[in-house]
């Protein structure tokens, strides 16, 4: 398995792929295939963050935030992904994701207040976009 410094996979994942090495190899190939397209790594990481938010995957969202930061995403860009989720997925999903994102950004030292003016205001016409 490939590892990036500072981004070691969870111990349970490591144990799983040790037990099932062919699945681990297939996972690596799947990742390589998905990353071999026209999107730059930062944009791809933001898209993956949106996918994890859409599936309400808490662990996946935490990991996606860490990986987006490592790919050069700014906290404001990550928060925009969460804001976009509100219109497409509903407020409960977006609020849950906001919590997960906040937790991860605080761990990374990118503290941001929960002020209402932290992001540009959204209008009702933005909700369906």
Predicted regions and their residues:
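Residues within well-ordered alpha-helical secondary structure of globular protein domains
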Residues: 29, 50, 84-87
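A general alpha-helix detector
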Residues: 12, 29-30, 46, 63-67, ...
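Alpha-helix boundary/capping and short turn/kink residues
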Residues: 36, 40, 58-59, 74, ...
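C-terminal structural segments of small proteins and small subunits
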Residues: 79-104
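Mid-chain, well-packed structural core segment of small domains
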Residues: 55-83
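Acidic, glycine/proline-rich low-complexity segments that act as flexible tails and inter-domain linkers
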Residues: 1-43, 70, 96-129
